[in-house]
Amino acid sequence: MIIKKIIDYFEKKYRAQKYWEKKGLKCGASCEIYEGASFGSEPYLITLGNHVRVNTGVFFVTHDGGTWVLRGLNNNQYKDIDLFGTINVGDNVHIGTNAIIMPGVNIGNNCIIGCGAIVTHDIPDNCIAAGVPARVIESIDQYSEKHKESFLHTKLLTSTEKKEYLLNLRKK
């Protein structure tokens, strides 16, 4: 029992995707799940498309905890109730640090969810959503157009080359 807990701890920390897939998460190809992301108590109700990045501290919530109060009412009418919702994330999606995705939400393809956003409603394809509650703030095309002059081509650099490049930018 203790050995299993130790293995689970290290697997969750260093091999998050494999850990959550064992628990039932459906995950497409080329996904990145960062340490500290949580798929809650029902990861089998969550589907991630291809090329999805889930950052540190992201929470997927598949149930409504408010039923706890109803179960506590004296009439016993609700003593065994729960309320669940699936969560579906499309292809090519980035979910920012500490975002919360609530039950029943569908996030479309080619979306960015901002850091700290609380997503309570569906997000359509090709959108950026942020805020509490999350709302669409612009399209992917608008984002690309707005930042195209600022994009830096650093993904093919080594970490040393990238550091040197970025530090030289600061000097200009």
What are these regions (language model features)?
Residues Y34-N106, V132-P133, S139-D141:
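Flexible, glycine/small-residue-enriched loop-and-beta-strand segment within the central core
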Residues D122-N126, H153-L156:
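Short arginine-rich
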